[in-house]
Amino acid sequence: VEGKISIGCGEIAAVQLLPKIIESFRQKYPRVTFDIFTATADLVKEQMDKGLLDIGLLLEPVDMVKYEFIRLNIREKWVVLMKSDDPLSKKETVSAKDLSVLPLILPRRMNVQSELASWFGNYYEKLDIVFTSNLSTNSAIMVNGGLAYSLVIEGAVSFWNQSKVTFRPLDPPLTATSVLAWKRGQPFSLATTKFIKHIKCFLGMDKP
């Protein structure tokens, strides 16, 4: 078995599963390589629909009608990015009231914005939204430049050097779930078919 398997994923905590899944798979099939594409769930789904990506690791809420999927037992935590020397960093958590008077960067995905709107409640209509962004890395650069505070999934953020930009969890906590998905009825390569089987076995959804 050989070939390339393409995986699309966001900057979310569930990505930490991929090294273990891929490593154990490549012990059986060392001639299989992987391509990782980083984007939001909407763009990953679009690429999957076009047959350009085999598998997606998606942050919910997301419409899964056309896909087979496994919901992962990992809680994705929402946090606010800020400069490390910001007065807000002295707090253990950040509330909607705290953020209601600050310039903000929000996620680009509309269904995710709806989740955040529910969390903000009455404060949402009064927010000073500077811009929206699809990935947290560029948002962090804007935060470091003093432009705004950014609401992001903790995900990869915890791996960053926090000497310039740090984060604090929201209060009350806001969490989400993620799914591993592939398009239903898609004719996959042998390598991808075996990898999907391996994922199911690895996560205890199927027998080897």
Regions found by a protein language model. Give the residues of each.
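Short, well-ordered beta-strand segments
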Residues: 4-8, 56, 81, 105, ...
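Hydrophobic residues within well-ordered alpha-helices
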Residues: 7, 48-49, 99, 140-147, ...
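Central regulatory/effector-binding core of bacterial HTH transcription factors
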Residues: 2-64, 132-135
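Secondary-structure junction motif
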Residues: 59, 102-124, 188-192, 196, ...
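Hydrophobic/proline-rich hinge and linker segments of small-molecule sensing/allosteric domains
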Residues: 68-109, 175-188, 200-204
